[in-house]
Amino acid sequence: ALAEVSMGDANEDVKAAAAGALGKLTARYTDAAGMGASELYLRLAQLYYAGSFRVLAYADRPLVLWYWQDGLKNQPVPRHLYVLKLAEEAAYDALRVSPDNSSARALLARIIASEKRATDALAATMGGDELFDSYANGLASAAGVVAAMGWPTLSQALGDSLDSGDQGAAAFLLDVMPHVYGGADFTTDHPVVRATMDPNAGVRLAAAEALLRFNAGSRLTSFPDPDGFMN
């Protein structure tokens, strides 16, 4: 936020103050030096999503999200979604500053996927709680929201999930991707093909099911041994 204000606020005094505060922060956290506002928001989202203590230690103790709407207000969040919602908020900020930030868009797809899976996993025990149910209802269309991000974004999100061992998000994305597949040719390094050889059996199974739904095995330039999916 300081980087954003230091570059874009109309008041020069505010810009100068923000730049000074940003300089002090980057002197302490040197890995943030030279990064633009969108990059910094993305990095914050990545740290939240990874559960990094570096950012969790500074998170608000109450399980609420703060926002500005004719004054400072807050919104309660279920405990199981709190860190994911912080990550989501930062990813949206990254896209607000720079709508072409493809890495932020891909991370957002993974965040929404993880929110949906986490909520579904707790539905049997938490269902009936008013706050939980309100968020569960809001996530009912999560697959459609993720699908609307398009094939390039989902491909990048799947690749990032495989690289980081984010198995739950990978399985969710593989379930959604057949809905937006446009018939593009696959290559051996495409994340869908890579998923068929992932160390996790659940991801391999999700990839196998996705390939069946693509109904386009002939387009694969290199098709792995199907007997290897569950080994």
Predicted region positions:
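Residue-level recognition of tetratricopeptide repeat
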Residues: 99-103, 200
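Structural detector for internal amphipathic alpha-helices that build alpha-solenoid repeat scaffolds
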Residues: 1-4, 15-24, 139-148, 160, ...
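Positions within ordered alpha-helical repeat solenoids
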Residues: 4, 8, 24-28, 47-54, ...
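Buried hydrophobic core positions in alpha-solenoid tandem helical repeats
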Residues: 1-5, 154-159, 189-193, 226-231
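Short coil/linker segments at helix-helix boundaries
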Residues: 31, 36-39, 43-93, 114-148, ...
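Helix-start (N-cap) detector for alpha-helical repeat units in TPR-like alpha-solenoids
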Residues: 38, 102-103, 167-170
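Short inter-helical turns and helix N-cap capping residues of alpha-solenoid HEAT/ARM repeat scaffolds
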Residues: 10-11, 165-166, 199-200
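TPR/TPR-like alpha-solenoid helical repeat scaffolds
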Residues: 15-26, 39, 103-129, 144, ...
